[in-house]
Design a protein with these regions (language model features):
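Helix N-cap motif at beta-to-alpha junctions
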Residues: 12-16
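Hydrophobic side chains in well-ordered alpha-helices
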Residues: 17-23, 195-198, 226
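An acidic, glycine-/histidine-flanked metal-binding catalytic module
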Residues: 66-171, 175
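Short Gly/Thr-rich strand-loop-strand
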Residues: 24, 30-62
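A short, charged, amphipathic alpha-helix used as a generic interaction element across diverse proteins
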Residues: 191-206
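Short, mixed-charge low-complexity intrinsically disordered segments
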Residues: 207-254
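Polyanion/phosphate-binding surface patch
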Residues: 1-8
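A short, exposed loop/beta-hairpin motif centered on an aromatic-Gly-Thr core
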Residues: 181-190, 213
């Protein structure tokens, strides 16, 4: 079965996600719900959260030629979408495939733990104080090892620079983490060999002290198409991560008391 297309709705919070799902479920449309995945109640192993609806298209008249093809609808909160945007951005600039369950173990663990922490902020997953302390400690450690804040800020900056370079078919991005320098150069289609040579030299020069990526304009456009309103904008992800890392014992205790007060009596 093939996809006819898809759409994504980004809403304020988790109650709004379920309200929208209810609207789809009770709406007056002819399409048949073929599959339903609640990744908020049961997140994917990599930490992905959201709701996915797969409908079989049912049309009339000229539209009947598409009958049986699938339409995928994704529902996410703003924070869940910020997390997914950050994953896509890191994949692009570090040449990994975290989204596909591959890539560096530390990055995968970081995003998985960040997803857990973000779910606590959104009150979708109550969590004891000890567990929150463990998650915060893990995020502090992984954020430091991966230099997350500096990298994400620089990736967003790199995208802005890329969009200022016209008539390029490839972009060479060099992020020097030691000297905190970012360099972006564009190469035309005729300069592909030169771009590859410069890339190899930059990789040798920076080694483990930075990120070097040679990215095609097609890949940049693909990311822009997938995230048109948040293209490589990791601002909300960083702000949410900051909020988690600011957890203090009193705040954690208050949140735990709030959770316990809402539990039904046994």
């Amino acid at each position: 079965m093939q996809d006819i297309g898809g759409c994504r709705a980004i809403v304020r919070d988790i109650p709004a996600v379920y309200q929208l799902w209810h609207a789809f479920d009770t709406g007056r449309h002819r399409h048949i719900l073929d599959d339903f995945k609640d990744y908020i109640e049961e997140p994917k192993e990599d930490g992905y959260r959201g709701i996915h609806l797969i409908y079989k298209y049912v049309g009339r008249g000229n539209g009947s030629v598409y009958n049986g093809l699938r339409i995928e609808v994704q529902l996410r909160t703003q924070i869940q979408h910020a997390w997914a945007t950050a994953v896509e951005t890191v994949d692009l600039f570090t040449r990994q495939a975290i989204k596909a369950g591959q890539g560096q173990v530390q990055w995968r663990e970081f995003f998985c733990v960040a997803s857990e922490a973000f779910s606590v902020l959104e009150h979708s997953e109550p969590m004891p104080m000890e567990e929150r302390s463990r998650i915060k400690a893990l995020l502090v450690d992984l954020s430091s090892q991966l230099d997350v804040f500096n990298r994400l800020h620089r990736y967003s900056e790199a995208v802005q620079l890329v969009e200022q370079i016209k008539e390029a078919s490839q972009y060479l991005l060099e992020l020097d983490l030691v000297n905190d320098e970012l360099r972006v150069r564009g190469f035309t289609a005729k300069e592909r060999d030169k771009a590859q040579k410069e890339y190899t030299e930059a990789e040798k020069r920076l080694g483990e002290n930075g990120d070097v990526v040679l990215v095609s304009v097609e890949n940049v456009n693909a990311l822009r198409k997938a995230f048109p309103n948040y293209f490589a904008d990791t601002t909300l992800f960083i702000a949410t991560l900051d909020e988690v890392l600011a957890w203090e014992s009193d705040e954690v205790n208050n949140l735990l008391i709030e959770w316990l007060s809402k539990r039904p009596e046994e």
